[in-house]
Amino acid sequence: MKTNILKGLLIAILFLQGVTVSSQQGQNDNTKKRQIVLFDGKSTNAWKDIKSDHFPDSGWVVKDGVLTVLAKTDNQAGGHDIVTMEQFSGFELELEVRLSEGANSGIKYLVTNTYPGSKGQYLGLEYQLIDNEKHPDALLGRNGNRKMAALYDILPARENIKINPPGEWNKVKIIVDGNRVEHWLNGEKVIEYDRTLDCFKELVRITKYNKLENFGGQEQGHILLQGHGNEVSFREIRITTLE
């Protein structure tokens, strides 16, 4: 029984990564595009701490045109997650990311405050950022779905992708066009999936997100940069809306 389930999920993964949604072909022909710089190398006005209504006073630094979340150490707490002030539906997000050795982080999108309250918890689909060689979480999950550029805990990126090592910059792009989503890394598309397909929903069902109503089905949400206890740097963050 377990073997049949795993085979079915593997087939689903292969299908999702090769899917073409014909109903959305040409959808962008009449869209109104709006380009927004989310980080220009200086200003953090587009972002806020998930625990407040403003950019964090500590844990993140801007230097030489780079936005960096600090690592958690014995002497410093490290940075919290930050989210965009604005919410987005259809968009093309582009940025460059530099991991420190052994780092683990992520870029979440279509993020909502799932558990509002004094602290809140912002959850959404996640583009995994991780040092595949040095962080143990990369070996967990299923079929590589916690490795670099994966849709965290749901879908793995395709094999043999080009990843620049820690200390070097990687170019990341995330496209959300209706229900079709793409992950890109260093100029190559590494994942494509449709959020409405039953096979996608089945993959969500076997994750820790299975108790969240309509996880992954949000029409709009924030962009989130994750503070996960490791130093990670970001630059050239911009988004083009597809409305």
Segments from the language model and where they lie:
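Carbohydrate-interacting regions of secretory-pathway proteins
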Residues: Q24-E243
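Bacterial Sec-dependent N-terminal signal peptides
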Residues: M1-Q27
